[in-house]
């Protein structure tokens, strides 16, 4: 699973990188230790015209529909289905297995029409109960996870999301058996706007995984109260039998 990750880029950088209108209202701040129910940036499509009330997005508002456009939104991590009576259920829905979203009673609606891009510097995993690792792409643009979003009136801000996971490959499988479904740039448009099909859920291409670094980090990330760049800094080399620091 992906239960902790880092997102540190500013709204201006992200909106430019994804060619998306910024709707985070200056509230997006770096977070090196994103935990369930935290606010996170996502890129999604809306047909709400610029300047129309945001309550119209995904909630049946009366604003006239316009052409789809990308927006950078701040949403709560942990999807709360529109029919949920208790929004606290979202804390358990931070991940969705990609193998089942097309048929799941919970997720198939959102897979059909509410897909989003989730930018991240990388994600954390623990090898068993031992050392934490930070999986990152290093320099360049952020990693992009496949996500789903939902609107719910009882959630602050109104929007929530989940991150899709897939089977881990290569040395990543030596840390955890699951990984986020990574989307290279040439899959963004189809993920956001293409018809729902199994092809959207294809594993990440080998070159996307080959570029990742498996970085041993310190134990402080285990406490959700901790934050800051030290959490993603490399620590001493892993002990014998642990995964190497890099994939290749």
Where on the chain are the PLM-derived regions?
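Short linear sequence motif anchored by a di-proline
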Residues: 1-248
């Amino acid at each position: 699973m992906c239960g902790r990750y880092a997102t540190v880029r500013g709204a201006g950088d992200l909106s430019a990188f994804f060619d998306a209108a910024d709707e985070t209202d200056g509230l997006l701040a770096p977070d090196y230790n994103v935990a369930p129910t935290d606010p996170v940036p996502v890129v999604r499509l809306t047909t709400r015209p610029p300047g129309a009330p945001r309550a119209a997005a995904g909630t049946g508002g009366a604003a006239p529909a316009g052409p789809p456009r990308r927006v950078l939104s701040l949403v709560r991590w942990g999807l709360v289905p529109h029919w949920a009576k208790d929004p606290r259920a979202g804390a358990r829905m931070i991940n969705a297995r990609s193998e089942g979203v097309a048929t799941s009673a919970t997720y198939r609606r959102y897979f059909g029409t509410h897909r989003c891009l989730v930018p991240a510097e990388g994600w954390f995993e623990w090898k068993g109960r031992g050392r934490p690792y930070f999986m990152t792409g290093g320099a360049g643009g952020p990693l992009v996870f496949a996500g789903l979003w939902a609107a719910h009136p009882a959630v602050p801000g109104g929007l929530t999301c989940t991150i899709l996971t897939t089977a881990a490959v290569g040395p990543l499988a030596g840390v955890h058996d699951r990984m986020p479904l990574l989307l290279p740039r040439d899959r963004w448009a189809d993920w956001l706007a293409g018809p729902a099909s199994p092809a959207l859920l294809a594993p990440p291409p080998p070159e996307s995984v080959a570029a990742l670094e498996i970085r041993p980090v310190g134990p402080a990330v285990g406490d959700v109260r901790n934050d800051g760049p030290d959490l993603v800094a490399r620590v001493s080399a892993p002990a014998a039998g642990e995964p190497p620091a890099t994939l290749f």
